[in-house]
Amino acid sequence: MDHRGRQQRLQHFLSNHRLDALLVVHPPNIRYLCGFTGSAGILVITGKNRVFFTDGRYTGQARAEVKGAKIVIARQGPLAAAAAWLAANRLSTKPKSGRGASPARIGIESEHMTVATRSRLAAALPSSLRLREAPALIEQARSIKDEEEIACLRSAVNLGSSLFDRALETIRPGVRETDVAAEMEYAARKAGAEAMSFETIIASGARSALPHGRASHAAIPAEGFVVCDFGVILTGYCSDMTRTVYVGRPSAEARGVYQAVQQAQQAAVDGVKPGIKAGEIDHIARKSLRNSGLAKYFTHSTGHGVGLEIHELPRLAAGQPEVLLPGMVITVEPGVYVPGKWGVRIEDMVLVTERGCEVLTPTSRELVAI
């Protein structure tokens, strides 16, 4: 991964956003910028310096993983050490005509910092340094994947997709949802996955109407839909897919609902291309379901970015103005959920290309009856 290049680009962005330094605390952002995969660390980036702070537990790991930044092992903890370093380096903006230097602006990831942590940081800094909420600079950069990241995502998608075969082997009337999830998760680990991307969703019968119906101890009924939503983490990158199967013999109504979701998903995928607004993809999916009379049962957004985290930018939700760009990897996952009856969702990961898009998920979207 080009960690040094990412750091240099961020340094350029700092001046554009009138920041003298950025304090990076969110572990996925730290990993993206310098390669560190541990849970305790802070990366400070200024116009000239890049310094990574961690504690003694991670000395060896930091030396093995961190790229492009000086490593400081902090006995007093990363936050206190980072604050002391900022105070000692006398950051300040250029003085205006006839005036002294203005306080330096230290950008913080406010969405990833607790109020208590921010208060401790502010108390540790001199008055010459002011905290400022930083825009989602790193998250925006992460939304466009380079070739190495895309290769990692392809591998994660392929491994994740292979687990659907294990689900089909396990799903039977009377089998607990948690048993299906356990078989899939064991197969993932055996195949080399670092972890699951999120808690596996196996929702059967009436529970399939729960969009996030994580696997329960409920037994799969003799008749009805089973929603399987799952993903793996491989080399740090996540996969995400959903398939819905039917246990028993699906009625004409059940097939019709499934077909409506399948058509909406295909219409949305067909709309993915550079330059289109993220909200427009959501609109396409809803319009298709509206034509089928099912739009009122589609209760969540159409998709999201995927990468080092399972939910990243962009958000494919109503009214979202962000424009899709080549290199973005997104999910497209419309669903229909009729409370107390059933639910259907189909989800693929999709790469935005220069001329359109590529569906990364290799698994068939046709209805499987068990």
Regions found by a protein language model. Name each.
Residues M1-I370:
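Active-site neighborhoods and metal-handling regions in enzymes and metal-associated proteins
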